[in-house]
Regions:
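Beta-sandwich/jelly-roll carbohydrate-recognition scaffolds of carbohydrate-active enzymes
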Residues: 175-179, 191-209, 224-226
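A short, Trp-centered hydrophobic/proline-enriched beta-strand micro-motif
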Residues: 182-190
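N-terminal glycine-rich flavin-associated loop
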Residues: 149-171, 196-199, 339
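Flavin-dependent oxidoreductase catalytic core characteristic
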Residues: 2-155, 174, 178, 182, ...
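Short, flexible loop/turn elements at secondary-structure junctions
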Residues: 124, 192-194, 210, 221, ...
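Short acidic, glycine/serine/threonine-rich loops at helix termini
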Residues: 130-133, 162-165, 197-202, 230-234, ...
Length: 673
């Protein structure tokens, strides 16, 4: 896998070099090498699901619904017991401190159930539960008004503990993992005041102090670590830093933060609140170090950026589970309000538009759950998560924002009450769009990841010709005004000789004919698929066993994803080297891939659920189809039928997504009792 990834990286890197962007090419090469190392560590030896759906061979439908199987099979009883005991603490007023932070009493309660060591091996004091169970726990805490708990613990067990499990020495594991399992907080400090989350540009650095057998950590001023969750006095922290002030090598170091700020003596240290509105119930800090001692043995060996990639795949999957839980908490509050509020012609919940918004929230929760558990199921079976881990996060966080807006439409001004649950959740809903990577940038990365193999194997010849055309006799890049970004009529008119040479080189390159042959074979294959597409899904051996209401959506999404291959080829032929800068069309392709993947994953997941859950899936799938194709009468009618079915289930309290949830009393109730 490592060798393959390194080869594949050359196409993207060489394209950037040919386009004259040498600095970005170097950064991309380093990042791809780090991703390659992470994949090798994970032994991800199976091609990613998203890539196979676009370029083939297609996965089985059993693989597409494997997330639902994992969710159904995991042990939930002990997790539910812990969550409900924690909820009781919240109702008793013991969950938060006077300044509305998670209390030590609540942490102790959760630790007594093993929550802080849920996925850690038993030899280090953990429960050795699966990451699918961590996703379930995160969703349950979030659904029951304790999203801050899921944020704290997910940070502990994904980014924090994963670095030690994947790259730490046995001595480091024995030292730190039992502390984490017992409830000691651990932060992962990457983000900086000056460079944000750009791992290749971190300015924090360490220098050797051989006399004292330690590193000296420096993070002053713009190098301060910022927005660091769980960074508290006395907590553990994994610090991303350069190994030398001007070094290109990035390292990772475990430290125990002092119990208080230190302003005098051998070193200086401070830990202050980040002053953010999101995650207000969590600890989130700005941390400064000057000449701070870090024992040599506390360095986690390995490329710090590689370790980050290794950990982030889990963080994005668990974030989706948190989105699912938060949307479920929204749904139970909105339904409680709509059942009591008088509207025109009766209770609000009688009307189609409020019910549609309720379906939007519930289907968003279902979608986020499906994405989370499929991603984790794929990860546990050695499938490369390229593409899927990214769209899992971006799609789930955007659905969360849509659900927030839907809740506000139904409940109106009461969602703005200072004590309302939605008021506390609102900044979190927006923050999830930028934490773990900003959504649009994630989508751009997703497109690159899932097309890398195809680019290397089929388009490398064209890129090589353009690179050669943009190199002078001495092997140096030509001036910007003489660069050929793409071969077209305009280029021939302005640079006819060089363009002719480039075209001759292209048709003389055997990879050009590999591309032509590939396109011909793909066209022939797609022609056959077009004929198959005329056969109704219910008569298809692939789709016939699925619930009838979902067959069309699985078929539609699979065909749409195959068409994305042609979309990508078209972008390359149109923009050529300019595609290294053409972010808008690449983002549009990324959004289309994301939407089609969501339709496919949601329909596949719901195919193994009850009828009401399937109705919610139909509601959301119909909406996503109309987002791609425009408003359609038949899809609108399917939505309305789904709303009716969900409404009947709500009357009977038969919506499984709401099981055991308790609504929060809404503000300014009109019934004194």
């Amino acid at each position: 896998v490592s060798e393959t990834k390194q080869t594949l990286s050359s196409s993207a890197v060489e394209a950037l070099k040919a386009a004259g962007d040498v600095a970005q090419a170097e950064d991309v090469a380093d990042l791809e090498a780090a991703q390659s190392g992470s994949d090798a560590k994970l032994k991800s030896n199976k091609a990613s699901l998203t890539e196979r759906l676009i370029f083939g061979p297609p996965p089985s439908l059993d693989e597409l619904s494997s997330g639902a199987d994992y969710y159904a099979s995991i042990g939930k009883a002990k997790i539910d017991e812990m969550v409900y005991a924690s909820r009781d603490e919240m109702f008793a007023g013991n969950a938060f401190t006077a300044d509305n932070k998670l209390s030590d009493e609540l942490r102790a309660k959760i630790a007594s159930y093993g929550g802080y060591g849920l996925t850690l091996p038993k030899e280090y004091g953990g429960l050795a539960y699966s990451y699918n169970q961590l996703a379930y726990m995160s969703e349950q805490f979030s659904a029951n008004g304790l999203s801050s708990v899921s944020i704290e613990i997910s940070g502990q067990l994904t980014i924090g503990a994963s670095a030690l499990l994947g790259y730490g020495t046995e001595q480091q594991r024995q030292t730190f993992l039992p502390l984490i399992a017992s409830g000691d907080l651990i932060a992962f400090a990457l983000t900086e005041v000056g460079v944000g989350v750009n791992a290749k540009r971190v300015q924090t650095y360490v220098e050797e102090d051989k006399e004292n057998n330690c590193w000296r950590l420096h993070a002053e001023g713009a190098r301060n670590k910022l927005y660091i969750t769980n960074a508290a006095h006395g907590a553990l922290a994994a610090i991303v830093a350069r190994k030398g002030k001007t070094s290109k090598e990035i390292g990772l170091f475990i430290v125990r933060l002092p119990d208080q700020d230190v302003s005098e003596g051998d070193y200086q240290f401070s830990c202050k609140p980040s002053n953010v509105s999101a995650f207000s119930q969590n600890i989130n800090s700005r941390v400064s170090f000057s000449h701070f001692p870090v024992p040599f043995e506390n360095e986690i060996k390995g490329n710090g950026v590689e370790v980050l990639f290794y950990c982030l795949r889990l963080g994005r999957c668990i974030l989706a589970a948190q989105c699912a839980g938060i949307q479920r908490s929204m749904a139970v509050d909105v339904i409680n309000y709509a059942r009591q509020r008088e509207g025109v012609g009766g209770k609000v919940i009688k009307h189609e538009l409020p019910l549609s918004n309720i379906c939007k929230i519930l289907s968003g929760a279902l979608m986020s759950r499906a994405l989370s558990h499929l991603s984790l199921a794929q990860d546990s079976t050695g499938v490369n998560l390229a593409g899927l881990r990214d769209l899992t996060k971006s799609a789930s966080s955007e659905m969360l924002q849509e659900s927030l807006y839907a809740a506000e439409k139904v409940m109106g001004g009461r969602t703005l009450d200072l004590d309302a649950r939605l008021t506390q959740l609102r900044p979190i809903c927006h923050a999830f769009g930028i934490v773990e990577g900003e959504n649009d940038l994630i989508r751009l990365g997703m497109v690159k990841d899932v097309t890398t193999n195809f680019t290397n194997e089929r388009l490398a010849g064209l890129l090589a010709v353009l690179q050669q055309a943009n190199t002078d006799a001495d092997g140096k890049p030509v001036a910007a005004d003489k660069r050929i970004d793409k071969l077209n009529l305009n280029t021939f008119l302005h640079m006819p000789v060089r363009s002719m040479k480039a075209c001759y080189s292209l048709v003389s390159n055997e990879k050009f004919y590999h591309l032509v042959g590939s396109l011909v074979r793909s066209a022939a294959s797609d022609t056959g698929e077009l004929v198959k597409g005329l056969v109704p899904a219910s008569f298809s051996s692939r789709y016939g066993h699925l619930p009838k209401s979902l067959q069309h959506y699985v078929k539609y999404a699979e065909r749409g994803l195959r068409h994305c291959r042609w979309h990508y080829i078209g972008l390359n032929l149109k923009y050529q080297l300019e595609l290294t800068r053409a972010q808008v069309p690449m983002l549009q392709l990324g959004k289309r891939i994301e939407t089609l993947m969501c339709i496919l994953i949601l329909a596949s997941h719901a195919s193994k659920q009850d009828k009401v859950t399937q109705a919610l899936a139909v509601y959301r799938c119909a909406e996503m189809v109309m987002n791609l194709d425009g408003v359609c009468g038949s899809q609108t009618q399917k939505q309305r039928k789904a709303i009716e079915e969900v409404a009947r289930a709500l009357q009977k309290d038969e919506v499984s997504l709401l099981d055991q949830l308790i609504p929060e009393p809404f503000a300014h109730q009109w019934d004194e009792q």
